């Protein structure tokens, strides 16, 4: 039986193969790099998918260390709860003593005292529970405020603020003493509670004054006095140098 096979390559294909530098062999075997032996070395589809998406398998396995760390940070310790509770008790005990000290020494009706104690008890419970609930918030706020206020200070400014508070407290106690001698214990209770309230308020006010208005009159006098005392051993030139150095410093240099 004669073979009627005709080649699929035409004269045009042969010319194109000669121009390209190689001849297209349509009758031969496939190229060597695509034989069946090397097909087995190619990675499978599952290997390609796992190598392309390694995060999905890692995310499926739970990390117990992360869960334990988050659980430990979210659950408050007994030490912090005890500190929070005791601090709020001390703070509102002081508040209750001051408020009750302003009201109880005077003559009031029985109905007024009952109404006052009920209203005061409700307000105290609300403030006490709110202070415990927002303990971390307002303590962080106070720390941030004190850091911003005290950081640009030198020691002289802090000492001046507390000296002003001490003088103010001494003035209140002197007035209280004279009022007790003149009119009895009635005005003594008033001035005592007033001094208990105004002392921390005045301390905060003086510190704010020193932070907003640096080198107020009394602070400037105090710093010049300290510079004069330090310059006693060095003579007049040392005093002038210290005075000029203090006047030339800006608030930005105090940080």
Curated annotation (Swiss-Prot):
Any one Pfam family match given in the protein's UniProt record, by short name? WTF
Instruction: List every stretch annotated Disordered.
Output: 19-78
Q: Membrane-spanning residues where?
A: 85-105, 112-132, 162-182, 187-208
Record InterPro entries: WTF
Q: Does the keyword field hold Transmembrane helix?
A: yes
GO cellular component terms, semicolon-separated: cytoplasm; membrane
Topologically, how does it sit relative to the membrane?
A: Multi-pass membrane protein
Q: Which domain of life is it from?
A: Eukaryota
Biological process according to GO: meiotic drive
Primary location group: membrane
Q: What does this protein do?
A: May act in meiotic drive.
Tell me which family the UniProt entry assigns to this protein: Belongs to the WTF family.
Recite the other comments.
Although the gene is capable of encoding two isoforms, RNA sequencing data show no evidence of alternative transcripts.
**Protein name as it appears in the record:** Wtf element wtf15
